[in-house]
């Protein structure tokens, strides 16, 4: 196991690719897509192209999308949950590849980031090569599906920002949007937790006709959002608005299960 040679040991249990949620598999697909382009650009000494590719990955795909969505899993799920373990596994894969890809461009920064975990000056990031991409990571159909999900999500997040500007909500977790899509749009979200993807406390995906005053984004014809606020109280642990929370210091069912499980393991 390469991770053991890099000082990671058994810090966490890895989640196998076939048991990961679709969002985690999409991140690995993006790494596979980028890897082939970076190898080609490295051969051609196109380091500006590599920088542009990685800037888009870090800014758009990771920071503004994946990390934003998965913070709740990392902070609030049970430590040994499959979803949280899958997230940590993917974040490790991102780290290992980013440090290698950035090494020729940001030599000192890449080394500092690498040594923060390896803590072995003789094991330099500059002695590494690009890790091979495992079979199965590249999945064009999955990539196309998540491109569609992100387009619908853009309408929802824009609607939430408008509601925030109007003073209807202070944070997205106060919302429970009803998202009107066509049949193809509904299929995109099959099996997914739409509220988690939108960072709201609740959400509905429906193929019903959207009301005339539903929020729309010009150029995106397959989605419209009817704004609604979430019912219930604010969970003191995860901050979601849930119907089972009835007191100021109450917590939701998910958090109650996690806390009780943690107490058992003490």
Where are these regions (language model features)?
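Short, small-residue-biased leader/transition segments that mark boundaries at the very start
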Residues: 1-12, 266
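Acidic, turn-prone loop/beta-hairpin segments
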Residues: 13-40, 67-159, 163-183, 206, ...
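TRNA-recognition modules of translation machinery and tRNA-sensing kinases, especially anticodon-binding
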Residues: 62
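Short cysteine-rich clusters marking metal-coordination/redox-active sites
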Residues: 235, 252-255
């Amino acid at each position: 196991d390469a991770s053991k040679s890099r000082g990671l040991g058994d810090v966490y249990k890895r989640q196998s690719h076939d048991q990961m949620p679709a969002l985690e598999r999409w991140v690995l697909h993006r790494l596979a897509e980028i890897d082939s382009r970076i190898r080609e650009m490295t051969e051609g000494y196109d380091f500006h192209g590599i920088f542009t590719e990685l800037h888009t990955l870090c800014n758009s795909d990771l920071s503004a999308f994946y990390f934003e969505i998965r913070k709740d899993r990392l902070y609030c799920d049970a430590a040994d949950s499959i979803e949280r373990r899958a997230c940590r596994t993917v974040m490790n894969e991102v780290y290992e590849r980013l440090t290698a890809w950035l090494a020729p461009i940001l030599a000192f920064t890449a080394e500092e980031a690498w040594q923060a975990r390896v803590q072995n000056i003789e094991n330099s990031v500059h002695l590494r090569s690009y890790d091979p991409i495992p079979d199965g990571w590249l999945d064009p159909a999955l990539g196309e599906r998540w491109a569609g999900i992100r387009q619908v999500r853009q309408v929802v997040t824009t609607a939430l920002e408008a509601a925030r500007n109007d003073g209807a909500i202070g944070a997205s977790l106060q919302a429970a949007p009803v998202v009107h899509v066509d049949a193809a749009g509904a299929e995109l979200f099959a099996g997914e937790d739409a509220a988690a993807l939108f960072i709201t406390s609740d959400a509905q995906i429906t193929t019903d006709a959207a009301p005339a005053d539903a929020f729309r984004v010009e150029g995106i014809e397959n989605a419209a959002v009817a704004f609604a606020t979430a019912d219930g109280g604010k969970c003191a642990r995860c901050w979601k608005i849930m119907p089972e929370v009835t007191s100021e210091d109450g917590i939701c069912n998910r958090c109650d299960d996690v806390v009780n499980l943690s107490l058992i393991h003490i």
